[in-house]
């Protein structure tokens, strides 16, 4: 459930940031807020994907290897992927969901009794896993991954931080 909670936390952080970043005059205009929020979510989603790809690169893996099921890929993942934390949930899965946040919100609305609270049933967990698998196939996400993998592959000086969010509320207060 880490990825589920993390995505909601980032969406809420982005909503609050978007609201506070507007002048008092613009805060009463829903369309201005909505546009600001969408732009900030794009920034957050791209940052999230960048951070997840840095982790995979560090582990000598890539998105294709961890998402396309084949005997070779399973062996590669079993050999190279090691973690003692929840980095996979907090970074890799969360980045997929952040880059598909509109459908994530729709999924939550459809599959939960209360929007924010995950309905903890085996069937709902299976639906959540299927939703994540669908995110892996999203052409928009794959396109962004390809762009970022090329950038990371060409860059020797990759940022060493693993900040979960690039938008920080203290920067505007």
Where are these regions (language model features)?
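Post-HExxH zinc-binding segment in Zn-dependent metallohydrolases
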Residues: 1-45
């Amino acid at each position: 459930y880490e990825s589920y909670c993390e995505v909601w936390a980032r969406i809420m952080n982005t909503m609050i940031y978007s609201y506070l970043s507007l002048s008092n005059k613009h805060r009463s205009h829903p369309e201005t807020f909505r546009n600001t929020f969408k732009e900030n979510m794009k920034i957050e989603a791209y940052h999230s994907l960048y951070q997840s790809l840095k982790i995979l690169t560090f582990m000598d893996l890539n998105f294709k290897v961890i998402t396309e099921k084949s005997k070779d890929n399973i062996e590669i993942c079993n050999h190279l992927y090691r973690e003692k934390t929840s980095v996979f949930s907090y970074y890799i899965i969360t980045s997929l969901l952040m880059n598909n946040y509109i459908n994530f919100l729709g999924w939550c609305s459809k599959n939960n009794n209360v929007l924010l609270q995950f309905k903890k049933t085996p069937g709902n967990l299976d639906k959540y896993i299927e939703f994540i698998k669908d995110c892996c196939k999203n052409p928009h996400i794959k396109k962004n991954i390809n762009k970022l993998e090329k950038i990371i592959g060409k860059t020797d000086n990759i940022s060493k931080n693993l900040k979960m969010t690039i938008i920080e509320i203290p920067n505007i207060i």
